Design a protein with these regions (language model features):
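N-terminal, well-ordered alpha-helical segments
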Residues: 47, 67-71, 80, 84-87, ...
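Short secondary-structure transition/capping motifs
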Residues: 58, 78, 88, 94-97, ...
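Short, intrinsically disordered, charge-biased short linear motifs at domain edges
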Residues: 24-36, 75-86, 226-229, 357-362
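Generic, well-ordered alpha-helical segments
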Residues: 61, 78-81, 87-91, 100, ...
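Non-heme iron-sulfur electron-transfer modules
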Residues: 2-28, 52-84, 102-130, 430-439
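N-terminal glycine-rich anion-binding loops that anchor highly charged ligand groups
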Residues: 43-47, 57-61, 233-234
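Cysteine-centered iron-sulfur cluster-binding motifs in ferredoxin-type domains/subunits
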Residues: 33-52, 83-103, 339, 369
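Iron-sulfur cluster-binding electron-transfer modules in prokaryotic oxidoreductases
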Residues: 3, 105-447
Length: 447
């Protein structure tokens, strides 16, 4: 069987002799950005960068953005001259996989965004901070939001809105509405619930915010698979990990939500902390760099979480899967979510697990690790460029569907699930879009 992941650019890395150098800022309040001078401008990142491929602009490439960062902190460019180019970066980290010099582009980008965030004014930033602070971490408000979306879709209101063409008045709103998945009405998961064998290895499952509202069934599928493989699953207090706030450069919110998440995930005293959302997992795995302990206890907690946190496919790949109850006849193409493949370096485990399911045939997807254009809320903030990047991805998906006869497209991140479902529906392809854990769960569920 051929490998189901065909990287668009084979990874390569070595340490450059300038690795310890930094770019000294002339602005007193700007970051040192250690490692900025490591870039040797070789251009290996260019064919790996979705925004460069879409625009052909050097300023929309990792190399170009690093140059702009350097000029900005040396007071040779105004913030307004570089901000649009940094905002258009997907933060997919694909350039880091391609870079032969080991440039930590993602860290440099986030530090620069964070230093700019306090200077930003206006309604857009205030609205995002309100959502990050008061909606995403709030269990009650999230459940109400989910119910209202469910009611909008199931009551006939959505059909009426479409029939009257009301969304055409606000094209941006129409784009956002098109991305909404069908909101599930599954039984809610609540803190303190436990599942699986009483003597099983204890694990905590992050419920999160957006993941639980849009994709609650994936949590139940995760519980099914973990329980079948001998794990005792505990549901912690709901928290938002702060990933979206981090991407927006709102470090104060990121830290506050981060510490809440650390305490919630460790409270059940698990052997492992399990994440089934690539974006959340990459954020939590970066807590050791993002969060600043204020006590010995916080330092201990941070070290403990760093040792225990795993993507669900990482944990399951530690040993052969338990026997399945029945076959799952599917031809599956796998899209490697950026924050799983490029940030967490979880690259082989998802397809290795899928290959163990009787009935599954893996279909190669060209450029499987190239970004789909979702990138958190990027597809809402930059819909045109996001659609262009998605169109490139969908060419490869269409080939896997029509030539390889794939009838399922799978990926391990909610943003990618939203984006690719939108792409598949727009292209009118006869494919389901599923999380890998949902495919595994089909083999364990009693029918």
């Amino acid at each position: 069987m051929s490998d189901s992941i065909t990287p668009h650019n084979p990874p390569s890395s070595h340490t450059h002799p300038m690795a310890s150098s930094g770019c000294k800022p002339l602005h007193g309040n700007l970051p040192q950005l250690d490692g900025l001078d490591i870039c040797i401008h070789c251009g290996m990142c260019l064919p790996a960068c979705p925004t460069y491929l879409a625009t052909g602009s050097e300023a929309e490439s990792p190399r170009g953005r690093l140059y702009l960062m350097k000029k900005w902190i040396q007071d040779e460019l105004e913030e307004s001259e570089i901000k649009p180019h940094l905002d258009q970066c997907l933060a997919c980290h694909s350039c880091e996989t391609a870079c032969p010099s080991g440039v930590q582009y993602g860290r440099l980008l986030m530090e620069t965004r964070a230093s700019m965030a306090p200077h930003r004014k206006g309604f857009a930033r205030s609205l995002k901070r309100f959502i990050f602070n008061h909606i995403l971490p709030n269990d009650a408000l999230l459940r109400v939001s989910g119910f209202l979306l469910w009611l909008y879709q199931r009551s006939g209101i959505q059909a009426l809105v479409h029939r009257l063409g009301l969304l055409k008045v606000i094209p941006a709103l129409a784009t956002q509405e098109a991305l909404l998945p069908k909101i599930p009405n599954n039984k809610a998961l609540k803190a303190g619930m436990t599942f699986g064998p009483a003597n099983g290895s204890p694990v905590t499952l992050l419920i999160g915010c957006v993941m639980d509202v849009f994709y609650n069934p994936i949590h139940w599928d995760t519980i099914t698979v973990l329980a079948a493989n001998g794990y005792r699953v505990s549901i912690p207090e709901r928290t938002c990990c702060g990933a979206l706030a981090h991407h927006a450069g709102e470090i104060d919110i990121t830290e506050r939500l981060g510490w809440q998440t650390v305490e919630a995930l460790l409270a059940p005293k698990p052997d492992w902390v399990v994440i089934n959302s690539a974006g959340c997992g990459s954020s939590i795995k970066e807590y050791s760099h993002l969060l600043k302990p204020q006590s010995e206890e916080q330092s201990r907690q941070l070290a403990e979480l760093s040792e225990k946190v795993l993507d669900v496919t990482e944990l399951l790949a530690k040993k052969p899967l338990a026997p399945f109850h029945h076959a799952v006849p599917m031809k599956v193409a796998y899209h490697a979510a950026c924050h799983l493949y490029h940030v967490q370096k979880v690259q082989k485990q998802p397809t290795e697990l899928l290959a163990q399911v009787p009935g599954i045939e893996l279909v190669p997807l060209e450029s499987a690790d190239m970004c789909c254009g979702s990138a958190g809320i990027y597809n809402l903030e930059h819909p045109d460029l996001s659609e262009e990047i998605l169109a490139e991805k969908m060419q490869h998906v269409r080939q896997a569907c029509t030539v390889g006869q794939a009838n399922v497209l799978t990926t391990g991140n909610p943003g990618c699930l939203l984006q690719l479902t939108h792409g598949v529906e727009s292209a009118k392809l006869d494919m389901q879009v599923l999380h890998p854990i949902s495919i595994l769960a089909k083999g364990y569920k009693q029918t």
